[in-house]
């Protein structure tokens, strides 16, 4: 048997696709409740998640709408409540400015009127300059020593949703030189 070679069985590496699961209204509802149990979501977010599950089904869109109506009726899904909670959280915990919260809620598919009401309620009594300073403290950003650091502070505050007038007011109080402020204003279109 010295010259005999053993051949190993060849295993096919074909991928076996699992048959797509079909969802009825109850199964889709359970999926949506599970998703909402993990975290709050907007109507647009939950629709996107459910549509991915029923895309191959001809009645998929109808099922999604029926489940959304059911979730709204049971008060599991409420964009106004979501927007209020989200705005308050981003302001109080992350110290983000008004513009950042508006942008984030738009991305999440919340209606503009709901966004306006929620953000106005959360930021109505807020001193934006003070909030921007709290954001900088939270991010451990100190008074800039040169142009590069001033630009870094400026960009961080813009990303956090603060108006450029508020940012320039802070930089001026920090005695950042006029040349640097002028350069930043030029770059900001202000």
What do the predicted segments below correspond to?
Residues 2-190:
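An alpha-helical, amphipathic repeat domain used for nucleic-acid recognition
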